[in-house]
């Protein structure tokens, strides 16, 4: 995150689009606001070991740090989104209990996060575990304040997202060309490809307002810039890369 000020200042910001910045603590929040951020995100986890590896503290300590960020954000009228990582499994602890996910989600929502994004960080979840986890979390957080964030490491992302949609979740995180990963979860692939998600939503008759052709063109652009191959099955099938 050392160059986020440069990145923020270099973005050609368009109306109607949010450019949230990940802020692990008050210092990060202050730097983000100074760089022009109008929305921030705090990122916790349902795994003690992952939290220690990721932000070098316990879950309880991370929540205390987030409380400082929330207080400052409220004072500045800046909306905050909350992320909970490892909701369906952890690279260090293995299976994570749905009750723990619900507990952390409830605490972050109660702090004032307008939305809680539930992340399958290592992409190990299945439709069954997604349903079990969401059932537990929805008892503590309104479904209208939930989002899912599915990595596609095991090829389960779209199936898991479909379950979430059927359970009432209407916000889904995705990544153009499926780029990304996690430095603290070796072997984890990127988030579900936005192209594949939009293709599926189109097939379900769900209007997204996203132009699939332009989306694929964007994927082609960034993959060429990074010298990477797209992870989007839709783009691969369209022979774009």
What are these regions (language model features)?
Residues 1-241:
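Catalytic cores and adjacent flexible loops of soluble metabolic enzymes
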């Amino acid at each position: 995150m050392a160059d986020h000020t440069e990145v923020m200042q270099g973005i050609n910001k368009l109306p109607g689009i949010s450019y949230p910045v990940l802020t692990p603590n008050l210092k990060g929040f202050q730097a983000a606001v100074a760089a022009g951020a109008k929305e921030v995100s705090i990122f916790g986890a349902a795994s003690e070991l992952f939290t220690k590896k990721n932000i070098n503290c316990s879950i309880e300590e991370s929540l205390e740090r987030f409380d400082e960020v929330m207080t400052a954000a409220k004072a500045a009228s800046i909306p905050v989104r909350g992320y909970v990582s490892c909701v369906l499994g952890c690279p260090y602890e293995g299976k994570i209990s749905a009750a723990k996910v619900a507990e952390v989600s409830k605490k972050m929502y109660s702090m004032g996060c307008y939305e809680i994004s539930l992340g399958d960080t290592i992409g190990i979840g299945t439709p069954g575990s997604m349903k079990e986890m969401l059932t537990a979390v929805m008892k503590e957080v309104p479904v209208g304040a939930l989002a899912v964030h599915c990595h596609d490491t095991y090829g389960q992302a779209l199936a898991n997202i479909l379950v979430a949609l059927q359970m009432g979740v209407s916000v889904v995180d995705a990544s153009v060309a499926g780029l990304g990963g996690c430095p603290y979860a070796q072997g984890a692939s990127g988030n579900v490809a936005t192209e594949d998600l939009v293709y599926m939503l189109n097939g379900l008759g769900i209007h997204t307002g996203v132009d699939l052709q332009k989306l694929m063109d964007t994927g082609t652009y960034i993959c060429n810039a990074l010298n990477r191959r797209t992870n989007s099955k839709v783009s691969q099938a369209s022979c774009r890369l």
